Amino acid sequence: MRAGPNLGTWALLGDAIRGDGTARRALILVENLSVPFDRRVWQECTTLRDAGWEVHVICPRGEKRDTEPEAVIDGVRIHRYPLRAATGGPAGYLREYGSALWHTVRLARKVGPVDVVHACNPPDLLFLPALWLKRRGARFVFDQHDLVPELYLSRFDRGKDLLYRAVCALERRTYRAADIVLATNESYRDVAVRRGGRQPEDVFVVRSAPQIDRFQPVPPEPELKRGKPHLLCYLGVMGPQDGVDYALRALAKLRDELGRTDWHAVFVGAGDAFDAMVELSRRLGLSEQVQFTGRIPDADLVRYLSTADVCLSPDPRNPLNDVSTMNKVLEYMAMGRPIVSFDLKEARVSAGDAAVYAPANDEAEFARLIALLMDDPEKRIRMGKIGQERISGPLSWQNSQASLLAAYAAACRDHAPVSAATRSAQKRRAVER
């Protein structure tokens, strides 16, 4: 059975369905992932649907999944466009984003009038179609998944150059255009208030949370350990800022400096740095002990996490990572796995005592903490239980549902639905013809 909002949460959106039975309409814009592959966006879609909204999504097509141009999944209407990911530096991003904006406006015209346009970054360019829809009566909810200026500094190592100033300007324009801002954690909320100039009452924290029904442990499979006593697991994106290189160097130190070879490691996921990380593993002499799976089905992911003894969160401290909530940390916690992390502000907020923390970017200490947990099964069990309790309690999606619906209620307060009247007029014109 699908868990929906409780009665108090439903009350926050009392006018989601009009007296004439016409639902308010929301249009969610995404550029960097397909839907429902983007789990946060999909949870938002189904929460709004359960609260009576008619939900549309515009997003790119996936390469291996989410490939249909049009789909209706569990009552959510998804409109997808072809998009080639950027290559070749800034010019590649200009081509990608220009194409995405053109397709987004094209499909938004097809969707028609909406009450809320909900734009998810990156990039901080979706305020452009959002402004176009605002002029047609929509309210604009900005869902800030990433701090793009910090992402730029962390990913490209170019300093505060002209492009950095440009992304800062785009962020400011997005904040100004939005009626309501959704932040993924308190650090992002502080940025929206301090740097974005938003009033605190207009910024709502909607934490990402794993789908509990997707992360149900299964019996461990010792064969996944490739004959070793311990399995170490990394799950997530492999981009330049995600720290897979730190994890690999820590594993080399675990072997070379601590003399530990009683482990097998699996890295699940893909990204821009995937090939470089496979090559780094080879150069470090880890090919026999480290396995890269790429993206795998959920069922296989759960098998690895259920068998893992220690999970790795090697995101280095940088301007973005220190204030970002890492989905992999939450997913490890949902599966009851102990975590080794670098000491980042939001990592501690999320994991608490479900993780042990190495000083920022200290690979030797990261390796030592892996060894410590491998040698202490009782501590691993305690940490795993703490993580599961946090995910089912203060970090649960049910709490985020309430905040999301409160944000939509605030966006629509004193704002008459535009879509019902407009659609009625469209129907009358169709009948007259």
Locations of regions flagged by a protein language model:
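Nucleotide-sugar-dependent
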Residues: 38, 242, 299-304, 313-334, ...
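Conserved donor-binding/catalytic core segment of Leloir-type glycosyltransferases
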Residues: 27, 182, 224-251, 266
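Carbohydrate-associated surface elements
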Residues: 187, 208-209
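Conserved acidic donor-binding segment of nucleotide-sugar-dependent glycosyltransferases
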Residues: 355-364, 372-378
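Nucleotide-activated donor-binding/catalytic signature segment of Leloir-type glycosyltransferases, i.e.
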Residues: 268, 275-302
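A short, well-ordered alpha-helix in the C-terminal region of glycosyltransferases
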Residues: 372, 379-394, 406
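N-terminal subdomain of nucleotide-sugar transferases
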Residues: 2-77, 208, 423-433
